[in-house]
């Protein structure tokens, strides 16, 4: 038989028949103990106790239990009849994330004990990272701060296991371990390489718990904008509006308007959801407008919206605007954008505040806000309020702020759940595929009824808005009391408790005298709003009625996000002059430590960022669970008796009682804000005894998501509620006329001006004196301070404008060729309200000839907000860097400017700007280097030498120096980042910037010459090189010359991967290298090993010398084996053991061969030496000695004769002979083989014969060095420097003796230099004046010195000899309009290889710009779309194009250049193509601008 529920009238009758003693007052003692439902470990927490009607002394014990272990939180003895207090406790180290909290109250006749489950969470300290700016250029230094505070914002002396930098490819490129934060703050810095991976980087801070705090910054190649383009328009417009006002304004960073042409494009884009043509330009609706900016730098346009069809679907529901402003004078064009949403929702309603619960008989409070589509309040409109659909309906009117306060009388409400809907306008539901209809949103809210057996209630009146820190807020309580429940009580005490940041913050009470018959009314009391209550405070108010019933209500307050440490930051004035002195004053809590920052507004225009703000700091706070969660498996032991739900049979029908579960009770109120309540008062609604379950039903706590969580029975797992985020910080008296003229000379232009720490004194004051930068801009400055007492405080961002009433700007080319002329423009800008008379002058110099352009006037009138440009036609006469100094001076003159009197500025009367121009000689630069190693032993040595110049040398271009060093690696040490005058744009070339630093550090360390300065510089180069090399890494751990290039097919290169693997393994001793990079590279290489132990080639060999005259596999395997042994891996390692088997097998074949195989044998000799195989090492060296070239007491090795002769012929077209790269490399490998033995310190166990041979090899190698200490190319430089460093360590001796070097020419002493232990690493240089000339160098004393003579000169290109490349260069105007054709043209290049080999190695095409022109970067970048072009670079006035290889098939490509500065008498510019590894193989061709033969002879 189906069971039926008992009818409601019968159920109510049963409730009335409940025993009277269930509701009667007993007068027994009452206990209330309150604890947060989640506790933090390591920070103070509170437990609050309320004891009432005690008739005996009791002991209170609050205990935290972990199984059989426990800790006491509170032990107290209560004597007073009534007491209410809170007590603090701290949980040091929790044994488990969950525990039981037990409350026991025991007296002679009373015993109360209850246990509840509890979460315990370690309080994670909020941590944030602040960088000095949001965006960086390659090569700049990233500065950042790590800050740690507790949940009260007091500094935490925390230690982080690791802080690291992660690049856009998620590679860890640098790290700091065990970073301490004394005082809660630590500053770190990190240098970016000159060629880093561009994109988003991260600073990652890892805590002990493993949690990571990440902060992002961008690395980008950029130029700071001079001005910004602002597009001002409504964010939203109604679809019925007919006009849209759009304003575009240009403002300089110093706040002044930009004069220029404004172009505005207004579009609504096409966006059918089923179309692939979203945003398709041809289907977009667009209009364009153009006009000169007004005096405010703005252009205002009223746009008619009808053309954009705002009511039609199928288009984006927004109008987008792109505005461009082209600055007058310079032609610089910048863009700004804006958009306006087209809204069909014409009104929106939302609840700003409302009661969470409702209590029958007490008014329900709520507030709603009505706004239009733009978010503007709609005043004086009637709103309809419906309760539970249309059962009850009310009308309220909005005030002038669009707010309507809702007050609903609930006296007659009987429903357990109240749903409230607020309506402004009803919607007409109409679905149309083509047209948009208007819509009005409604506001909805729900409130559950609170159960009270006596129908007694209290309700807090809503507090609207955000409460300010420091204010006193009145709390109003509405009450409705049952007289029977009050009995004869004369007063009633209201207890309140404030919960903030998950913990109990404060508590108190207020007594209400009871008047006879007054059971309904309002009582109020004040509370003070304090910073510790922010951002949200939860107030719970409760009282205990004489019938033992507890009634309560709760309300949340939004608190101003304030800090106890108030920080004020100020400059003495809002504006300063460039280069003046000022100071930044900071005020905060005494003895605070303050971190100050000031960033150029231009940086923030380029990369806006979120400021470090109260909101961002408060977002870092961990969040506790707000709802009490049942953890299980604690059996349910409610303090209240349950009602047995027995069936009732009536007229033969069985009725089941209906239990109402929808009402909330006082227990739910406490639970809703995360409080555990232990009490013997009545806080629960009646419950039926459980029939089938061992555990209680989880209470509904008023939040749908909490109810959903509680539906999981026995849930013992809970994800972390602690949220950690990271933040970036923005980063920001008159002089009388007779006094000396004040002049500014501007040359200091930083992007971050201030990045300093300032400790405050006992009065809370601090001052930072600073020099104002020369940038005419606005600086954004801010500060945060840390105090051990009041914690963290933030200042507001302040602005400081650097400005002067008038200033001068110079427009110059980067470089010109001697004989060319250019127009130097000096523009004076006047931003004063009055006119000034200005004299503009250019300081004359013998280095150039300057002639004024146009009518020459001694002075010029410039009125307010106007500018004047004065020009000179300049012809440089000297070579090198020529400085141009221009001055604008305000004159005291009776002469009127029109009808206005010219005034003299009080602060600055003169502005001077100095800018350089590089003046280059005509033709192509050549360099010859002569190196000599002289070792006098207490006797004078003399060397005669001659500097000759070729017949076709360019007059005045020759310059020469002789350098003297006391150390074999001295020159290389001076030029570690400039060993080669070649580009470094690929994965192998970058290693020449990386690896030599390791050898220098090892050499200096072994010879005890390592200083902190050298170590710091070398390590910084290693860090930079490590960053760059990761650009060439593939996802599988391998490396290739140009890296993983996205869609273009590329694979790892076996040879380069081995090179990188060895270098990274060796660099670990000096810098952080991520282990996975070494592991992954080694694993990848291991996969390339064949069964015979040899390695197979993957990727192309850009250097043909690696082929070595034998099977490529043997040479490559020898190279990889050397790399593995140098890591070092032991010879017993399986990969190494198998590789050595490959080499031994190969040597057996080579030793019986009649061919030379010099390159391969050199590698084999060194590999066997590293492996400790002395026998094989001796065999190979003996074979190599037969191939050795002995000359002039030196020894070296060279390639087979036929190749050598071909190369020598090629040299006849080039420089004075220097050994090819491959010969230096193979000779260096032989030197390494001689210097390496099996001992732990191999260089100390060498025989005298080995050292003698090594010395002869060193003499030859040292003669091949270039003027920077490198050699011809990358591999020869790396291997030769490694060999020289080993030789230097083997032969190093300290001596107190000195060597003197005297240089004479024609009987005249050019210079005398002295070398000793104190300066042996110092590069000493003498400039040689006689060119051509005969010189004598005399060396005396005891020791060795390295002499290097460098001769540089320019020659005019001649068709001499047969070049191994064909090169043709043509130019063509891009615009045939005669007035414009000289401003832009195309350079087309055809190139091929016609040398002796089937194809070239990697080739560089170097295109120098003609003066006054710059490359169009997108057209250069587009060249990389061609399969054979691997990379392009734009270097000042050069374009570099990397080509993988060339054959005899002609390859053609082109790119565009455009005019930057007008230059007359344009000279041709050279294009050079050369083999990167055989630098003697090259060709040169000149090109001219297509209009250079015009009558004007230039582009001026």
Curated annotation (Swiss-Prot):
Chief place of localization: secreted
Cross-link (Isoglutamyl cysteine thioester (Cys-Gln)): 986-989
Disulfide bridge partners, by residue number: 48-86, 249-298, 267-286, 469-562, 594-785, 642-689, 835-863, 861-897, 935-1344, 1094-1142
Positions of the UniProt region annotated as Bait region: 686-746
Location within or outside the cell: Secreted
Signal peptide range in chain numbering: 1-24
Tissues of expression: Widely expressed. Highest level in ovary, testis, uterus and prostate. Protein found in plasma.
GO MF entries: brain-derived neurotrophic factor binding; endopeptidase inhibitor activity; nerve growth factor binding; protease binding; protein-containing complex binding; serine-type endopeptidase inhibitor activity
Keyword Glycoprotein attributed: yes
InterPro entries, A to Z: A-macroglobulin_rcpt-bd, A-macroglobulin_rcpt-bd_sf, A2M/Complement_sys, A2M_N_BRD, A2M_TED, Alpha-macroglob_thiol-ester_cl, Alpha-macroglobulin_TED, Ig-like_fold
Entry superkingdom: Eukaryota
Glycosylation sites: 55, 61, 157, 382, 412, 568, 883, 944, 1005, 1390, 1448
Gene Ontology cellular-component annotations: extracellular space
Subunit structure: Homotetramer; disulfide-linked.
Family, similarity comment: Belongs to the protease inhibitor I39 (alpha-2-macroglobulin) family.
Its job: Is able to inhibit all four classes of proteinases by a unique 'trapping' mechanism. This protein has a peptide stretch, called the 'bait region' which contains specific cleavage sites for different proteinases. When a proteinase cleaves the bait region, a conformational change is induced in the protein which traps the proteinase. The entrapped enzyme remains active against low molecular weight substrates (activity against high molecular weight substrates is greatly reduced).
Protein name per its UniProtKB record: Alpha-1-macroglobulin
Organism expressing this protein natively: Rattus norvegicus
Lineage: Eukaryota, Metazoa, Chordata, Craniata, Vertebrata
